């Protein structure tokens, strides 16, 4: 009996550490999901340096309380899973959002973004942001357009003067 309690305490401590280190935490509900779907989801998450864990609701509640995320405690009823990343802010939300569009049995419930409890709307808006590479491309093209127009004007001026 004491061994089981010690294992649960260790699980709470490990989850508390993960939550403290995470930039983004997503809580989602799942029902009737086949193992193959979870395997595909975990594989996709690993590619983006994200992790998914399923704990008992009691362990998740205790870890949320230990990390001062009391706003999450009410969500831990039924089948819930956690996805988190300590390196990327957008990937966990984006991946779970995309998978929830593929399978209606996955529903994003809530989460934590940079140590702040986030609503479903905040997570969905985070998930709809373009990737970092696309944002950088948009920035560079926005900066290059005026330069290209200036270059074209200077070229026309030089042709007119000749």
Curated annotation (Swiss-Prot):
The keyword Disulfide bond does not apply. Forms part of the ribosomal stalk, playing a central role in the interaction of the ribosome with GTP-bound translation factors. GO terms for molecular function: large ribosomal subunit rRNA binding. Belongs to the universal ribosomal protein uL10 family. Pfam families: Ribosomal_L10 (PF00466). This is Large ribosomal subunit protein uL10. Keywords: Ribonucleoprotein, Ribosomal protein, RNA-binding, rRNA-binding. Part of the ribosomal stalk of the 50S ribosomal subunit. The N-terminus interacts with L11 and the large rRNA to form the base of the stalk. The C-terminus forms an elongated spine to which L12 dimers bind in a sequential fashion forming a multimeric L10(L12)X complex. It comes from the Bacteria. NCBIfam families: PRK00099.1-1 (NF000955). CDD domains: Ribosomal_L10. GO terms for biological process: translation. The keyword rRNA-binding applies. It comes from Phytoplasma mali (strain AT). GO terms for cellular component: ribonucleoprotein complex; ribosome.
């Amino acid at each position: 009996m004491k061994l089981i309690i010690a294992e649960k305490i260790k699980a709470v401590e490990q989850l508390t550490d993960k939550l403290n280190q995470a930039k983004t935490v997503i809580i989602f509900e799942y029902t009737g999901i086949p193992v193959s779907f979870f395997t595909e989801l975990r594989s996709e998450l690993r590619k983006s340096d994200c992790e998914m864990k399923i704990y008992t609701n009691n362990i998740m509640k205790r870890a949320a309380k230990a990390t001062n995320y009391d706003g999450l405690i009410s969500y831990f009823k039924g089948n819930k899973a956690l996805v988190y990343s300590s390196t990327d802010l957008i990937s966990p939300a984006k991946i779970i959002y995309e998978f929830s569009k593929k399978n209606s049995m996955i529903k994003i419930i809530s989460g934590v973004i940079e140590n702040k409890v986030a609503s479903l709307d905040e997570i969905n808006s985070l998930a709809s942001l373009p990737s970092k590479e696309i944002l950088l491309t948009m920035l560079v093209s926005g900066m290059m357009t005026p330069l290209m127009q200036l270059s074209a004007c200077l070229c026309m001026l030089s042709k007119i003067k000749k």
